[in-house]
Structure formats: C-alpha cells, structure tokens
Amino acid sequence: MKIKSALLTLVGALTVFSSSAHSKDLKIGLSIDDLRLERWQKDRDIFVNKAESMGAKVFVQSANGDDSAQISQIENMINKNIDVLVIIPHNGEVLSNVISEAKKEGIKVLAYDRLINNADLDFYVSFDNEKVGELQAKSIVAVKPEGNYFLMGGSPVDNNAKLFRKGQMKVLDPLIASGKIKVVGDQWVDSWLAEKALQIMENALTANKNNVDAVVASNDATAGGAIQALSAQGLSGKVAISGQDADLAAIKRIVNGSQTMTVYKPITKLADKAAEIAVELGKNEKIEANAELNNGLKNVPAYLLDPIAVDKRNINETVIKDGFHTKESIYH
C-alpha cells in the first residue's frame, strides 16, 4: 500500500508539474506596420482574440510606417522575453539584423502577410499575392479592354506590392504588346497613403489631359486617393479602377459606381491561421505548409490563402456573408 500510495503521489506531482508547464502563458509579440490603416486594425483584433483564446498573451505595437520605429519596437519585444515574434513589416528589406537578434534568443519568427527578405524566418502566412494582382487586372480589362491605363503601385518597399504588380503584368503584358492597352503612367505610392495617391493621380490627369480610361490601383487606400482626383475632374465612375482589402469605404464606392472592384482577402481566416501557427511555433509543434517561398536567404515554409475579387454583383455573397461588413453599414 505504501508503494502504491507513493506512486500515486508521484504521478499526482508529475501531473501538476506537467499541467503548470503546459499552462505557462506563451508570449507573442505582434509588430504591425501601421495601425492608421483600417485593414491592420481588423487583423490585430482577430489575431489577438484567437491567440488569447488559445492561452497566449499578445503584445502589440504599431510602427506607423516608420522603419526605425519598427526595429526599435521589435528590440523592445525581444527584451520582454517573448516566445514568438509575428511581424507585419513596413519595409521587408531592413529587418534581417533584428530578426537575427530574435533568433539568437531562441524566439520563433513568423512573417505575416508580407514576406521579409534575407531573414531567418520560421514561417510565412499570407494570401497568394500574385493572384491578387491578376484578379485586379482581369477585372479592369473586363470593363475596359482597350485604352489608356495608369498603373498605381503600392509602397516600393513592400514586397507584396511587387508581387501584385507581377500578377497584374501577367494579364496586361499581352494586351500592351498587341496595342490594345497603352500604359500612360506608372508610379508607386509611398506607404500606401491616399494623399500621395491623390497627388500622383492629379499629376497623371494633367500630363494626359484627362485621357485616362483605367487605373490599376493596388489597394483601396490608393484607389480612394485616385478617385478623389478623378472626381475633381468629373471622371468618377467613368474611369475603371481596382483596389484591394475590401475596406468599408471602398465597398461603398463600388456600390455608388466610383470604384470598379476590390480584392477581398478573408482576413478572419488569415489572422486565425496566423494565430494558430504562432502558438504552434511557440510549442515547437509541426506546422502544415502548402507552399514555399525563397526570401533570398532560405526557402521559407508558407501557408497561402486564396483572395476573392469583389464587385457590385457579389458583395452579398462575400463580405456581407462572412460578416466582414454589415449590410446596414454598406447601404446606409
């Protein structure tokens, strides 16, 4: 009986030890490019809720589009002894050194939505960003199969912006070569800011004497700025224009006819998946990958989700059905 009692005591102690070790809060640092953009506010809320529901603590900081601020914030997170670092980079070219610091401390690193180049990443989660660009260009070509096109790229330091452009040109290059489409301007928008897109579009309209038939804009913020310039010249609704992110303002513009389409990236799926992967990384669990991308240093295992083109015809079946926006907020 004594032996049995001792064994039971030992098992009980081990169970308590195991349980307390398992319940130790996993600490995740979430470094966000710029919370001034509606898009990232949604990602933050969904990610934090999911990670916390899985027993993790999440520390969030926004760099407001500033490289040095993001590096400093990541260093601060490293000093807080986080287990996993999740980064939405402002500039995917400047974080390799600070990521090396994190790795030396045994911290796992997950790139969220945007790939970070030449860095020792553990995993990458995003959408198929070349497909985003293809959807944008295909939608605009369907409305304006010929004419003068203006290409409005995103931030020149955002790797995704380059992938969007790559996808766009897969569709546009044959039409440019055949002469059906003429590119009358091509500019990138620093930090994806609407006010910069407004200035770029104003200058483009002046340079082309308002003779622009379509704008391939890479996201909704830049589309919004461009549409302001088009409206001032009485061209709103006459010039086809793409977007991305399914921002509420953009969906409203699609309803009123000033924006042609947006690309909806089901952010709930992305943020939930990223939170799951972050927790799995922290627990050293095996992670399911469905792709691999080379970032210049290594082949990074990745999980890529499918984006969806949204126009007037399928708003109900996409953003409303998913609860991304309510019918009331869109139509009232």
Swiss-Prot record:
<feature type="signal peptide">
    <location>
        <begin position="1"/>
        <end position="23"/>
    </location>
</feature>
<dbReference type="GO" id="GO:0030288">
    <property type="term" value="C:outer membrane-bounded periplasmic space"/>
</dbReference>
<dbReference type="InterPro" id="IPR050555">
    <property type="entry name" value="Bact_Solute-Bind_Prot2"/>
</dbReference>
<dbReference type="GO" id="GO:0048029">
    <property type="term" value="F:monosaccharide binding"/>
</dbReference>
<comment type="similarity">
    <text>Belongs to the bacterial solute-binding protein 2 family.</text>
</comment>
<keyword id="KW-0574">Periplasm</keyword>
<dbReference type="GO" id="GO:0015753">
    <property type="term" value="P:D-xylose transmembrane transport"/>
</dbReference>
<dbReference type="InterPro" id="IPR025997">
    <property type="entry name" value="SBP_2_dom"/>
</dbReference>
<keyword id="KW-0813">Transport</keyword>
<dbReference type="InterPro" id="IPR013456">
    <property type="entry name" value="XylF"/>
</dbReference>
<keyword id="KW-0762">Sugar transport</keyword>
<dbReference type="InterPro" id="IPR028082">
    <property type="entry name" value="Peripla_BP_I"/>
</dbReference>
<dbReference type="Pfam" id="PF13407">
    <property type="entry name" value="Peripla_BP_4"/>
</dbReference>
<protein>
    <recommendedName>
        <fullName>D-xylose-binding periplasmic protein</fullName>
    </recommendedName>
</protein>
<keyword id="KW-0732">Signal</keyword>
<dbReference type="GO" id="GO:0030246">
    <property type="term" value="F:carbohydrate binding"/>
</dbReference>
<comment type="function">
    <text>Involved in the high-affinity D-xylose membrane transport system. Binds with high affinity to xylose.</text>
</comment>
